[in-house]
Amino acid sequence: MNKFKFYGCLGILAASFTFCACGNDDDNGKETGKNDVTWSTDGGIKACDHILFTAAGDANVNDNGRQIGNGDQEFVFTGKQTIKKGTYILKGWVYIADGAELTIEPGTIIKGDKQTKASLIAERGGKLIAQGTAQEPIVFTSEEAKGNRRPGDWGGVILCGKAVNNNTEMQIEGGPRTKHGGSDNSDNSGVLSYVRIEFAGYPFQTDQEINGLTLGSIGSGTKIDHVQVSYSNDDSYEWFGGTVDCKYLVAYRGWDDDFDTDNGFSGNVQFALSVRDSKIADTSQSNGFESDNNASGSTSSPFTSAVFSNVTFIGPKAVDASFQNNSDYINGGSVYPNNGSSLGRFQAAMHIRRNSHLNCFNSVAVGWPIGLILDNEKGDTQGAATAGTLKLNNIWFAGMDVLGTDFNKIYEDGLYDYETGTVDNTKNSFAHTFFELAANNNRHFDSADGWFDRTGYIPSADSPLIGAASFTEAILNGCTAVDYIGAFAAGDTWLDGWTNFDPQNADY
């Protein structure tokens, strides 16, 4: 995806200190137990220690309100408050400021306002505590009626922390003012657990969107597990630096990449599923993994060196036997938002480039045009693979058109010459050769027939994926050792209760 910065307060008027009484005695979990409301300004933006309102306008602050934010395009929350179980509308870019803490109860539904590109943004030192349960997940979704929801109906969820990245202090992408980065790798930005994020990723310009879930320099003190991002208008998940570990992630029918890692992200991610929609792909070419050290491919440290294990990538060919990788076929289908987002083609299960040292183990990818791209256009990703600082071990591919290529948007499995820009089809690509090295213990097949049950991603009882895992590499010490390749054991139930694979028709 294209990286960019978007500055400014969008015409927000600065407010002076004002004080008013709360409109209701029920403080909806506000920890001070007081009815006083404190207004201030933060960077020229109105700020308040209460976050709920009955309607747009500062005078409508009310802890029994159903609107999150005062209705301005940007609003800063400075207090500590719990949002009780219920249904709410999120308006504008709502920042959880340094020292503030927002807790959301299980079973809460938060609908993002389309007009204000609503987004919830935890800034450095702020905490978002969204701890749902399997029976009562917390849902961030579109305000549109069922049948009319589209990718990009609202902004998304952004967490920014104080952990290390390889560009010191960075502006988060997507529009908001927020910066991330620091030196505290154990920083705690809160909890996201049993959470769904649906129809997010509002496009400000072509290829300039907030992701479904954006994580900027998030530290290991943060808890992230059991999160499903569905129909994001950009990447489903993107990490910019940071050390946070994540488990039990679902990327469902996103627009661009499923799991995008940048700027020195070094956490562990285990048990993750991506399932594509054959009609949705981005103009930049959609991938399962996209991974950069940084935009220039420099040797800035820390390198992007995250460890992924037990990932299942279900590509467009696996979900649609009639799939064609062209613009006539990839038309957005029934969820095309007509909001300026440009469609493109599908590319690879794994696109690793720009000096990334990404690691992946015990994973399976099925039905992509390309299995693996090791791209040396900027930096020396192939050198990292040769040196063993980029590890791809015990990975199974099936049903790929080509096993590997060496350059973005090249669909030929031949050795790429970076000086002449030509492909030598008499030789295998570097990516192909690396994938097949005996020491890597990878395998590729023409078909995945018999591997999965009727879901298309959970292994059948006699699947060859069961019993095929290996956790002998020391780099996997931070992961849970299991005996299967991919995100699931046979009959696994970690998706049960909290996920929804038809959010278009959910009654909210």
Predicted regions and their residues:
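C-terminal motif of bacterial Sec signal peptides marking the signal peptidase cleavage site
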Residues: T18-A21
